[in-house]
Curated annotation (Swiss-Prot):
Catalyzes the formation of 5-methyl-uridine at position 1939 (m5U1939) in 23S rRNA. HAMAP family: 23SrRNA_methyltr_RlmD. Keywords: 4Fe-4S, Iron, Iron-sulfur, Metal-binding, Methyltransferase, rRNA processing, S-adenosyl-L-methionine, Transferase. This is 23S rRNA (uracil(1939)-C(5))-methyltransferase RlmD. It comes from Acinetobacter baumannii (strain AB0057). One of its GO terms (biological process) is rRNA base methylation. It comes from the Bacteria.
Amino acid sequence: MKQQAKSRKPQQPEYIFQVETLSHEGRGIAHYGSHPDHPADKHGKKVFIRYALPGETVKAQITHEAKRLEEAEMVELLAEPSANRVEAVCPHYGICGGCSMQHIHPDEQIHLKQNVLQSHLQHFAGIQPEQWLEPIRSLQSDYRRRARIGVRYLPKQDRLILGFREHHSNRLTSIHTCSVLDKKLSDNLPELRNLLQSLKGKAHIGHVELAKGDHEISLLVRHIEKLNNADVNQLRQFALHKGWQLYLQPKDQSLRRIDEEQGAMRLHYALNAFDVNFAFSPLDFTQVNATVNEQMVQLACELLQLQQGERVLDLFCGLGNFSLPLARCVGAKGQVVGVEASEEMVQRATDNAKRNNLVQASFFSQDLTKDFSHHSWANQGFDALLIDPPRAGAYEIMQYVPNFGAKRIVYVSCNPATLARDAGVLVQHGYQLKKAAVMDMFTHTEHVESIALFEKIQEIND
């Protein structure tokens, strides 16, 4: 069986390799020396091969050479494919840089991500959870409810490109569909491209952002020069026809909704298991995968084992995605304190608590990378702690954790390396890693989302 690659760069050497294992980001790993045509001076050198899977024999073209390793791209599958190989569902896969694992069976994707988390915990902290929980799985398509899509006008060709960046490149590749984007968004991409192509100011548009709430869709157009009235009216008519909210964002980053009389500048989503509803702006951070998000919040609340009347601290709380469900769990006699750097997001969380009649939830603005020990909210004592930091993790916060007095900590992570680093500090503070799970928030990509439960097991003089 032979399988041709999607592209081939001229004047780059090609070799046959036996693929041995997968890297953390899903590339096949092979070594020089497994085939007679390999250069003798390269024997033993490691090669990372895009699209190749363990057990396969492939022809690969070298794309990058370094002293200790090389990178390559599979151009031909020379024997039987791996049992874990599947047909990619997207016609743009291999050119568009959005997905990197559509050729890998979903079960193997999750297995790989769990191995990544396990490896990082061992390497950085020397620990493993007492129990691995079942992974939280995603839909395999139509799961993304928001996307930023690049726009570039090519004047010599009078052609507008609407699409995503190519793999490891700043070049945009034109797309007419996206298999992981919500179908109500993906199906409108060709019509949206034609609309943007027709605008006089198309050369001044940098990107568009599509976002979907449970019942609304928004279109945000980012432009570096002011659009004329005719262009704005064309965008308005398109949005009215679709029933979408339309927003313009000029170079100064301000956000303006067109036709504000049509309703408030908000989208909405609900977490039905907790009877809470959230309002958010198109620029607010929200989890892109609604199905996984709801399962994640439910699992976090289950792991914390909250009782009525308990006190919970939610760090990096955003618009209250965890805070409001936590407030439901502790009841009217409990208290949830949410802390977030962005004052705008704190106001959004406060408004969301009010709209859900959750008076037991309060929110504070604080840069959590700076000393916050003098603030009153940090010295109240808590039964439980939830941390959902950005990719950089929560290392600066770890020194304050003993002062919170939390018996249980749930750490939600989008970076297994920083989770493992911070886990090592929590262990030093007398916590034990009890449970962990991976969450397939970004299926078909190498991004690893995870959740971990730590419990206090001993008192340590910090």
